[in-house]
Every structure is written in C-alpha cells, then in structure tokens.
Amino acid sequence: MHGLFFDVEPKPGHMPHYFTHVDRLKPILAQHKGLVFLDRYRPLDDAGALLSHQLWADEEAIASWRADSTHRASQSAGRKIHFDGYRIRVGAMVAHLTQTESTNLEDLPADRLLVVAYGRAPILLAHARAYESVNNPGRFVTLAPHGDRATAQVLARDAIGQGAEDLRIFAVARDYTLTDRSEAPNP
C-alpha cells in the first residue's frame, strides 16, 4: 500500500475552485483502479489550507491517476491559477499498528519516515500537524514527519498510547512542492 499526502494552500478565495475540480474529477477517479482510501482534512492550525490524503494499492495505480489527462489539466490549473503553494509526499507503507495489532517496528527503514495517526481526536506528537476531516467531522489524522527510525518508533508507540485507533508509517520516496519539484515524477 502507498500513501499520498497532498497539502495545499489555495490562494485567497480559491478554495471553492479546488472543490469544483474535485467534483469534476470524482467520476473519472472512480474509473481508476487501485484507490483504497481518500479523504480531505483541514489543518487545525490553518483553516485556509487542506490535506488530500489517499491510500493506493501500489505505485502503478498512482502513476495511472497522475497521467490521466483530465487530472493533469486540473493539476496545471492548480499550479498556474489556484494555489499559493503545495507539498506532495508519496511513499510505501512500512508499518501498521492498531490498539490490538502491530507490525515489527525494528524493521523500519532508516530515514524519511512519515508517522500517520488516525482517530477520533487529534494526537499530540512532536513536530506534527493535526487535521480534521472535511467529509467526516470528528475524524482526525496527525502527520509527523521524521528522519530517523528511532524517533518514528517512539512517536508510533506514543500515538497508540494516546488512543490512536490506527497508525501507519510510510517511507517517503518523493517529497516535492510547487517551487521545488526536484523529486516530482516526470510527466
């Protein structure tokens, strides 16, 4: 499973345009295989920003969606017209924990890890950002990026201890922004 985390900062007054593109893309996205989960969240510290969080079966499914011509037109409109900034992180899930089950945290990769906690309340983690679902108010996700295995292990255990219902750790393969596209895939 692969996670995609699209943090976006629409220009003032452009959030409705973002959702117009979302509505236009829904039936097209439904035709693509591999999307497991999609929700949109507002950061608790910035009501003008948004996170689109997606889980995909594999990298090929993400590539197929990224290459869709209608989606590419929306991407271009976002970059050129609607967004002040964005950040996209993509990576494979390398660990999954719940209140009753867990994977071995000792086998995590060494760096570029993103700890993601899900639950009915924001989880307070060091250097993390918490978001509330736009589609399902009262559902939260907390993202904690960390560069080393030991810190990610501590944060994961702390999040479960705070009541996170579900926790996933992703090894980030690509991390790029509107202005730094050095890790962006080629069109």
How should each PLM-predicted stretch be described?
Residues 78:
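A short beta-strand-loop micro-motif that forms or neighbors metal/cofactor-
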Residues 1-49, 60-67, 81-187:
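Short S/T/G/P-rich N-terminal loop/turn motif that feeds into the first structured element of a domain
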